Swiss-Prot record:
CDD domains: EF4_II (cd03699), EF4_III (cd16260), LepA (cd01890), lepA_C (cd03709)
Topology relative to the membrane: Peripheral membrane protein
Chain positions recorded as GTP binding sites: D26, H27, G28, K29, S30, T31, N147, K148, I149, D150
Entry's localization field: Cell membrane
Superkingdom of source: Bacteria
Domain tr-type G residue range list: 14-200
Keyword entries, A-Z: Cell membrane, GTP-binding, Hydrolase, Membrane, Nucleotide-binding, Protein biosynthesis
EC number: 3.6.5.n1
Gene responsible for this protein: lepA
Family classification: Belongs to the TRAFAC class translation factor GTPase superfamily. Classic translation factor GTPase family. LepA subfamily.
Organism the protein comes from: Corynebacterium aurimucosum (strain ATCC 700975 / DSM 44827 / CIP 107346 / CN-1)
Protein name: Elongation factor 4
One GO MF term attached to the UniProt entry: ribosome binding
Primary location class: membrane
Length: 615
């Protein structure tokens, strides 16, 4: 194995190149990263495995990158103006999914350039576009690349034109590589060395240190490991540092780089990317996007661009067995170490017991969090239907923010505001009609449409977030045979006619099934839930009405028939009045039972009723 000159730090900034890869799910970003690792020989052949940087099982299984990873690599360009010089590449692998835009924006802050990676058989997708615009806003140097040119279905000419049209470059400038065979990858790295600017430091290496945190992970043995990009100054082990957003002080126990495993080093200088370990066990003290500086004589101004990510979707998570409640709390706290954007607070439900109300960035984030809780911590969970945050103004002018249907104020409401999103959908031309129909059925308002090429169309809509968090994505995929891609971003709020629909069992509301829906679809929701519960709840000894209500007005009803014992079996050929006496007696018993009995709802019924259907 060649000696890794990238393993020594305090490199001259002019020899450093920081870049990230922007790509859609499945466009081959992790495979390309694998090839780059092999070419630079930092991973020995025997240790190489596919998707080397995706550490979590769930990342490999779903083929997506969730956490930003970083690697420091040596590269000696074989062509171009830096031929033969030792260049240190720092690659930051970013998530490509819409829910993780904040993770992407922080990773972009740590770079000077980006490789825009597009599948040569599929063309650019909506989320890639969103991340590309984010990179352009940050003034990053963009290197357009078509991947998977070894595929028989690849059409590099067509998509090179499409990319050139979007970025405003010449089609010939779009590089062609194959992450699988490695073709074109060395040329790509030479281009990175040539085109991406070296990091610049605003105040130089002798100024007070300023470093931006772009990720933090929790290590069971060493506490929180914080990944940083140095902007100014130097950090060395045993220094005392302060986190500017939280104002906490720590001692640096270890400073190091990832190449591609963690290696201790003597310290980090301007432009370098590495990690710090301070022995902190509580991740709330290391916020992603925060600025780290020296505790004494530190920098006065933090780096700009730090924002607390706001949850957009809320859902209740309840353990199936109540004994797991403390474990669920521990698990959520551990996940929060890794995931700054996850928020949670305890919640009790009459039907489901104790649990947590959790806030997520979006649906994928919610699904992955739940998956990780079940897989990494072995918990069995029920999650309630997702909801968003509504701003409710009561008749007396009092305002409240509601993100749980059970907190919905009673009485008359003056107005209700719901969050809306601006959505971009890219679909093949033949599916435009059915996609527009779907968006209109979800109360979407069209903002415009553009042809990206002769057979791909970009549609822009403004839609209520509450309508898309449930099953919009699945419906869109099924209507477009899986060819559509979408991206959404927050766009404020709008007035809406929303009501809370309660589901009553035997006259008592069950909080887990309550939902906030638009008045026009309240009837549909009521009918759907009552029918579903009628099939799921086993028959009781007495008749149970399942009703849907808005306030005190019942809008839908189904009955679960009572189980009856045959009381006439012992009455041989007797008189009708004898039979009637027995039936009346049974009826009176059932009536008494109904007034005092409670309905037992099995756990499975909750799980099934709360899971979304393909309706």
């Amino acid at each position: 194995m060649s000696t890794n000159f990238a393993a020594t730090t305090f490199t001259d900034p002019s020899k450093i190149r920081n870049f990230c890869i922007i790509a859609h799910i499945d466009h081959g970003k992790s495979t390309l990263a694998d090839r780059i690792l092999q070419l630079s020989q930092v991973v020995e052949e025997r240790d190489m495995r596919d998707q080397y940087l995706d550490n979590m099982d769930i990342e490999r299984e779903r083929g997506i990158t969730i956490k930003a990873q970083n690697v420091r690599l040596p590269w000696i360009p074989r062509s171009g103006e830096f031929e033969g010089q030792e260049i240190v590449m720092q690659m930051i692998d970013t998530p490509g999914h819409v829910d993780f835009t904040y993770e992407v924006s922080r990773a972009l802050e740590a770079c000077e350039g980006a490789i825009l990676l597009v599948d040569a058989a599929q063309g650019i997708e909506a989320q890639t576009l969103a991340n590309l615009y984010l990179a352009m806003e940050n003034d990053l140097e963009i290197i357009p690349v078509l991947n998977k040119i070894d595929l028989p279905a690849a059409d590099p000419e067509k998509y090179a034109l499409e990319i050139a049209h979007i970025i405003g470059c010449e089609p010939e400038e779009v590089l062609r590589v194959s992450g699988k065979t490695g073709e074109g990858v060395p040329e790509l790295l030479d281009k990175v060395a040539e085109l991406i600017p070296a990091p610049t430091s605003e105040f130089g290496e002798d100024a007070p240190a300023r470093a931006m945190v772009f990720d933090s992970v929790y290590d069971t043995y060493r506490g929180v490991v914080t990944y940083i990009r140095m902007m100014d100054g130097k950090l060395t082990p045993r220094q005392k540092v302060t986190m500017m957003a939280t104002g906490t002080n720590h001692e640096l126990l270890e400073v190091g780089i990832v190449s591609p495993t963690m290696q201790k080093c003597k310290g980090l200088g301007p432009g370098e990317v590495g990690y710090l370990i301070t022995g902190v066990k509580n991740v709330r003290e290391t916020k992603v996007g925060d600025t780290i500086t020296w505790a004494s004589n530190g920098a006065s101004e933090p780096l700009k661009g730090y924002a607390d990510p706001n949850p957009m979707v809320y859902s209740g998570l309840f353990p199936i067995s109540q004994a797991d409640f403390p474990d669920l709390r521990d698990a959520l706290e551990k996940l929060q170490l890794n995931d700054a954007s996850l928020t949670f607070e305890p919640e009790t439900s009459v039907a489901l017991g104790f649990g947590f109300r959790c806030g997520f960035l979006g649906l994928l984030h919610m699904e992955i969090t739940r998956d990780r809780l079940e897989r990494e911590f072995g918990l069995d969970l029920i999650s309630t239907a997702p909801s968003v945050t509504y701003r409710v103004v009561a008749e007396d002018g009092e305002e409240s923010m509601v993100h749980n249907p059970s907190d919905w104020p009673g009485g008359k409401l003056r107005e209700v505001y719901e969050p809306i999103v601006k959505m971009t959908i890219i679909v093949p031309e033949e599916f435009v009609g059915s996609t527009m129909e779907l968006c209109q059925s979800k109360r979407g308002q069209m903002g415009g449409m553009d042809y990206l090429s002769e057979d791909r169309v970009e549609l822009r809509y403004t839609m209520p977030l509450g309508e898309i968090i449930f099953d919009f994505f699945d419906m869109l995929k099924s209507r477009t045979k899986g060819y559509a891609s979408l991206n959404y971003e927050e766009a404020g709020e709008q007035l809406a006619d929303l009501v809370k629909v309660d589901i009553l069992l035997n006259g008592d509301p069950v909080d887990a099934f309550s939902a906030i829906v638009h008045r026009d679809s309240a009837q549909w929701y009521g009918n759907k839930m009552t029918k579903k519960l009628k099939e799921l709840i086993p028959r009781q000894q007495f008749e149970v009405p399942v009703q849907a209500a808005i306030g005190s007005k019942i809008i839908a009803r189904e009955n679960i028939r009572a189980m009856r014992k045959d009381v006439l079996a012992k009455c041989y050929g007797g008189d009708i009045s004898r039979k009637r006496k027995l039936l009346e007696k049974q009826k009176a018993g059932k009536k008494r039972m109904k007034s005092i009995g409670s309905v037992s709802v099995p756990q499975e019924a909750f799980v099934a009723a709360l899971s979304t259907d393909a309706e």
